[in-house]
Amino acid sequence: MVMTDEMMEIIESSRAYVATATTNGVPNVVPIGFIKPLDNKTVLIADSYMVKSRANLEANPKLAFVVQDAAKYPYQFKGSVEIFESGEYFDQVVEWVKETNPLAPKPKAAILITIEEVYSVKVGDAGKKIA
Ligand SMILES: Cc1cc2nc3c(=O)[nH]c(=O)nc-3n(C[C@H](O)[C@H](O)[C@H](O)COP(=O)(O)O)c2cc1C
């Protein structure tokens, strides 16, 4: 799956609502500000505050998200995650958060998402797989 330039631009510039689930299917959704694409297949999240989301991802490394303005950008992204508490991706989120807000706490982890599927949530073709 490859994201379009428009998809990458809107992820870069927008908040997202990120859904995870426990292994027995209890859903959880949170707003996330520190989310950005690294390339057309991967998206990075700074985990600074995740509790249930993080526990869910440790046990069930799958998530889905939509961007805040889903009326204008009606995409539902789904992917698998890897969690890094050190190394290149971790250093990248630490620097990113520090540059954006020097008063923000140091992130606990980098969450790297490999995008696997994108669906439309647009009224009319809602639910259609688009990539
Ligand atoms: C506007 C907004 C932006 C947020 N951005 C982030 C973020 O970038 N990273 C993060 O770890 N938590 C962020 N949070 C906190 C999470 O939404 C949430 O409170 C946290 O993951 C704990 O919830 P959980 O136990 O369901 O994971 C943000 C919260 C709000 C209200």
Model region roles, listed by residue range:
Residues 1-131:
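Binding-site signature for planar aromatic cofactors or substrates
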